[in-house]
Curated annotation (Swiss-Prot):
Membrane topology term: Single-pass type III membrane protein
Gene of this entry: M
Lineage per the UniProt record: Viruses, Riboviria, Orthornavirae, Negarnaviricota, Polyploviricotina
The name this protein goes by in its record: Matrix protein 2
UniProt keyword annotations, A-Z: Disulfide bond, Host cell membrane, Host membrane, Host-virus interaction, Hydrogen ion transport, Inhibition of host autophagy by virus, Ion channel, Ion transport, Lipoprotein, Membrane, Palmitate, Phosphoprotein, Signal-anchor, Transmembrane, Transmembrane helix, Transport, Viral ion channel, Virion
InterPro entries in the record: Flu_M2
Function: Forms a proton-selective ion channel that is necessary for the efficient release of the viral genome during virus entry. After attaching to the cell surface, the virion enters the cell by endocytosis. Acidification of the endosome triggers M2 ion channel activity.
Site (Seems to be involved in pH gating): W41
Activity regulation note: The M2 protein from most influenza A strains is inhibited by amantadine and rimantadine, resulting in viral uncoating incapacity. Emergence of amantadine-resistant variants is usually rapid.
Virion surface membrane side: 1-22
GO biological process: protein complex oligomerization; symbiont genome entry into host cell via pore formation in plasma membrane; symbiont-mediated suppression of host autophagy
A single cellular component GO annotation: membrane
Residues lipid-modified (S-palmitoyl cysteine): C50
Length: 97
């Protein structure tokens, strides 16, 4: 016997719920909370990088460079850019024996 047949029973009109008091305010509130939780979870998974970056740095684009000399700022920018750049001309070939 499958789990589906234990919870819901197919009828001629469609799927019938065995809950007798589905109009109970507590059941309605729990359903609304469950649906909102699902929506928020989906949005969190879709936009987690944007959300947590915004929480970490606020509206700024990155860590603060206030009080840092201009030469060090330029060096930091170069390091960040070099970490992002990919040299397509160099690949590592690994041969398995």
């Amino acid at each position: 016997m499958s789990l589906l047949t234990e919870v819901e029973t197919p009828t001629r009109n469609g799927w019938e719920c065995r809950c007798s008091d589905s109009s109970d305010p507590l059941v309605i509130a729990a359903s609304i909370i469950g649906i909102l939780h699902l929506i928020l979870w989906i949005l969190d998974r879709l936009f987690f990088k944007c959300i947590y970056r915004r929480l970490k740095y606020g509206l700024k684009r990155g860590p603060s460079t206030e009080g840092v000399p201009e030469s060090m700022r330029e060096e930091y920018r170069q390091e960040q850019q070099n970490a992002v750049d990919v040299d397509d001309g160099h690949f590592v070939n690994i041969e398995l024996e």
